[in-house]
């Protein structure tokens, strides 16, 4: 996965041209897999062209959302965290791409599309008068002892919350809500939509909201 600004095109990553035209595009913060060329190819195919840039977000952290995705992981979401600065990525979307992204993110079901305060996100193409957007989880943040859990894979300064790896948070959910062997349970979550949705309902009932 690239660790620098890049251009998504032909289903992969290329260097981002220094004169890339950001005007007219909507900057959308990517806090999980939407930063990866592999995920973007799954969502947009090989014909899409999109800038993906590295950025810093202040007063938020990237934490686990209180639901299980159909591919068997706990998705990420943003949650307020005073004095924290977290590394995020930005997808620069045209009108058609934004509509497609809304569909893949289940806007109105799992997420709402929200504007961040102007200047909260800094990085390539972003200025103090430009507001980036993000997908706010309708399910709330997965909580342990009443506090959200950050993603250990995401770099942050002055982090306020405990941080878990993806496998650790899945094993915690299994310990609290699952039965049988971990792998058997996880396989069932991927293959059984009603069972996964029932678990998501239990997680969201105990979630915390910003």
Model-derived regions: residue spans:
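Glycine-aromatic micro-motifs
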Residues: 1-210
């Amino acid at each position: 996965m690239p660790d620098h600004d890049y251009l998504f095109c032909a289903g992969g990553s290329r260097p981002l041209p220094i004169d890339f035209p950001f005007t007219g595009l909507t900057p959308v913060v990517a806090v999980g897999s939407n930063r990866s060329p592999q995920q973007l190819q799954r969502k947009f195919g090989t014909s899409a062209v999109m800038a993906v840039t590295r950025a810093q977000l202040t007063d938020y952290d990237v934490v686990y959302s209180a639901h299980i995705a159909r591919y068997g992981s706990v998705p990420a979401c943003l949650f307020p965290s005073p004095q924290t600065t977290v590394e995020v990525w930005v997808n620069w979307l045209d009108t058609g791409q934004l509509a497609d992204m809304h569909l893949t993110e289940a806007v109105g079901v799992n997420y709402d599309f929200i504007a961040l305060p102007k200047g909260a996100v800094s990085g390539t193409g972003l200025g103090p008068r430009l507001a980036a957007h993000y997908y706010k989880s309708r399910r709330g943040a997965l909580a342990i002892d009443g506090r959200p859990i950050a993603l250990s894979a995401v770099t942050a300064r002055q982090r306020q919350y405990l941080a878990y790896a993806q496998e650790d948070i899945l094993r915690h959910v299994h310990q609290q809500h699952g039965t049988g062997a971990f792998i058997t349970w996880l396989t069932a979550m991927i293959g059984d939509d009603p069972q996964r949705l029932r678990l998501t309902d239990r997680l969201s009932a105990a979630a915390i909201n910003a």
